């Protein structure tokens, strides 16, 4: 019996060291060398180096002077990130969308873009389509006392056009740039 147990324990120990220690350290080392920013969470910092957030996780922005992210079913908490899981026929979904649309609606701007009233699959999507950011530009410019053209140009300069997929605007990066503007 011990003849069979010894090789099994040796295999367990060796495989545990390889898969639990050596491989993770190797992958972490390669990631730190090849992609240091991404390996450390794609963090966004202010001028003093203070971490304000990650490019990968949405944050809640209250107030008329900020661009708003997509709604979050989990109130932007990473621990409880999830979709709302409400069926299209659920009255609670219709009520929430109507409430969010009323909050985001800007006179004479047409219908509120869908991205501003619907949650993403994770509830933490940090990006908006450019048209959703442009829709908010008038509200933000008015609240901050800035020329609309300046705010629209800021949205355009923060529009990312990936090789594959639609153009997007990272709301945290956009709001950081907005905070740096003189009123």
Curated annotation (Swiss-Prot):
It holds the Pfam family KdpC. Keywords: ATP-binding, Cell inner membrane, Cell membrane, Ion transport, Membrane, Nucleotide-binding, Potassium, Potassium transport, Transmembrane, Transmembrane helix, Transport. One of its GO terms (molecular function) is ATP binding. It is a single-pass membrane protein. The chain crosses the membrane at residues 10-30. One of its GO terms (cellular component) is plasma membrane. It is found in: Cell inner membrane. InterPro entries: KdpC. The keyword Hydrolase does not apply. NCBIfam families: kdpC, PRK00315.1. The system is composed of three essential subunits: KdpA, KdpB and KdpC. Belongs to the KdpC family. PANTHER family: POTASSIUM-TRANSPORTING ATPASE C CHAIN (PTHR30042), POTASSIUM-TRANSPORTING ATPASE KDPC SUBUNIT (PTHR30042:SF2). Part of the high-affinity ATP-driven potassium transport (or Kdp) system, which catalyzes the hydrolysis of ATP coupled with the electrogenic transport of potassium into the cytoplasm. This subunit acts as a catalytic chaperone that increases the ATP-binding affinity of the ATP-hydrolyzing subunit KdpB by the formation of a transient KdpB/KdpC/ATP ternary complex. This is Potassium-transporting ATPase KdpC subunit. It comes from Pseudomonas aeruginosa (strain LESB58). The lineage of its organism: Bacteria, Pseudomonadati, Pseudomonadota, Gammaproteobacteria, Pseudomonadales. The gene is kdpC.
